[in-house]
């Protein structure tokens, strides 16, 4: 049976792990979202989240975005390549409703799957 959890081993936790992704990433982006990725030496993908106060002033808005990204990653993790992903929120992200946001995330995950197959 496939596990659809988001355990500690599926998260980027330390600044060094984030820095590693920021060095030479594959990018997939829209005006509101960028997802950076870099191959890891593990057998599973990992996710890191960055949602700045600059783009979303209120904590409940930042939490909503992070919750939606975690859920999307959790459901897509078995299709994703063994990469470290960093989600970066940009201006205008707060104006997206949940359905539109989920559709955009799905397109970005698909783009990363295609990029991984090419490399």
UniProtKB/Swiss-Prot annotation:
Keywords: Endonuclease, Hydrolase, Nuclease, RNA-binding, tRNA processing. The keyword Iron-sulfur does not apply. PROSITE patterns: RIBONUCLEASE_P. Gene3D superfamilies: 3.30.230.10. SUPFAM superfamilies: Ribosomal protein S5 domain 2-like. One of its GO terms (molecular function) is tRNA binding. Its EC number is 3.1.26.5. GO terms for biological process: tRNA 3'-end processing; tRNA 5'-leader removal. It catalyses: Endonucleolytic cleavage of RNA, removing 5'-extranucleotides from tRNA precursor. One of its GO terms (cellular component) is ribonuclease P complex. Consists of a catalytic RNA component (M1 or rnpB) and a protein subunit. Belongs to the RnpA family. NCBIfam families: rnpA. RNaseP catalyzes the removal of the 5'-leader sequence from pre-tRNA to produce the mature 5'-terminus. It can also cleave other RNA substrates such as 4.5S RNA. The protein component plays an auxiliary but essential role in vivo by binding to the 5'-leader sequence and broadening the substrate specificity of the ribozyme. This is Ribonuclease P protein component. The lineage of its organism: Bacteria, Pseudomonadati, Pseudomonadota, Gammaproteobacteria, Pasteurellales.
